[in-house]
């Protein structure tokens, strides 16, 4: 919400938070706000008011040794989703085009919420085995032994990250549906991939 431009002599601050009471202000280098000041403005602008909300919103992305990091539009989606969850919004829909890294975006959201201890048990649902296997070997591989794929309706509640097919949790006999082995509040976060 804050941007700066310079002509080499001074700075012009464009502040959508209107923290100083003005949208645009001329600044000298000596008056340039500190990172802490900018963080306070950001929190005010986004409505982040509690320490818990701040801890969730401030948690870093996952960076692996390959140097892969979220693209700018993924960062926007991740940040908005995490901030909405921090503000206790229960339902979020991300609409992203084919090939834009929806699964990687989901991984980053899960990672930030999981590592910040906000959401400890996560269910990731997909529509086909190939997508689950690819997800486990690919973007989600960093969860290692904390993750499992629910197969053949066998459930081990010792894990924190669960991958499953929609149809893998249901049966023709409703009394034997695998999802019934979980209490309604077992999962802190449910992500449905390819929700169409």
List PLM regions with ranges.
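Walker B catalytic acidic pair
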Residues: 193-194
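Short acidic low-complexity segments
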Residues: 148-156
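ATP-dependent helicase/translocase motor core
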Residues: 1-121, 126, 130-145, 157-161, ...
């Amino acid at each position: 919400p804050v941007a700066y431009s310079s002509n080499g002599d001074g700075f012009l601050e464009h502040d959508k938070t209107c923290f100083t009471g003005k949208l645009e202000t001329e600044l000298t280098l000596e008056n340039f706000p500190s990172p802490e000041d900018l963080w306070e403005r950001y929190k005010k602008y986004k409505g982040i008011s509690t320490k818990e909300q701040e801890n969730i919103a401030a948690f870093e992305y996952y960076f692996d040794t390959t140097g892969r990091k979220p693209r700018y539009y993924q960062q926007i989606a991740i940040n908005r989703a995490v901030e909405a969850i921090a503000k206790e919004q229960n339902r979020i829909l991300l609409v992203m085009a084919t090939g834009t890294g929806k699964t990687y975006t989901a991984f980053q959201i899960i990672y930030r919420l999981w590592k910040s201890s906000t959401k400890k048990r996560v269910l990731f649902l997909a529509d086909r085995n190939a997508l689950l296997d690819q997800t486990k070997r690919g973007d989600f591989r960093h969860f290692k032994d904390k993750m499992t794929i629910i197969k053949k309706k066998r459930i081990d509640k010792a894990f924190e990250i669960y991958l499953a097919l929609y149809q893998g949790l249901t049966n023709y006999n409703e009394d034997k549906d695998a999802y019934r082995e979980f209490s309604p509040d077992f999962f802190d976060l449910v992500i449905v991939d390819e929700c169409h």
